[in-house]
Amino acid sequence: MILETKKMSLQNLTIKSQEILQQAQQLAFTSGNANIETEHVLKTMLNDKDSPIEYLLKKNNVNVNYVDEKLEAAIQKLPKVSSGEPAQALSRDANNILLRATASLKTFKDEFVSVEHLLIAILQGSDNTAKLLKDAGLTEKGLVAAITDLKKGST
């Protein structure tokens, strides 16, 4: 993985979270984008059928198709690289996701950053991806409750 991040080791991530970031990098690369953005991360989390993200969003009455379509449109509008190789590093907003996700480990008494932590961190942001989730009806309180239920094994 070529990903660069500041102030955090990628070894603090679960294997699934590492895979998501690799897929986000690939999506950014194939889209011709300069950096890996929060839109790429959320889009790959939504598209990963082994990820609990779709369940967590639906548990909070979020229209997953709406979010997915808006993400696709947002990715198409991201700046394209005209020369050189695109998508080698996380954008500032995407790097901040990792920092916030690490901070949320204490809330759930976890050791590694999972995709659930990444979703909370995206929601806590102030960028367009966070706004999209909030506009779709996702709240941090509702998300934490759904994650807690998921960890208990109730659906």
PLM segments and residue spans:
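Histone-fold recognition with a strong bias for associated Lys/Arg-rich disordered tails
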Residues: M1-T155
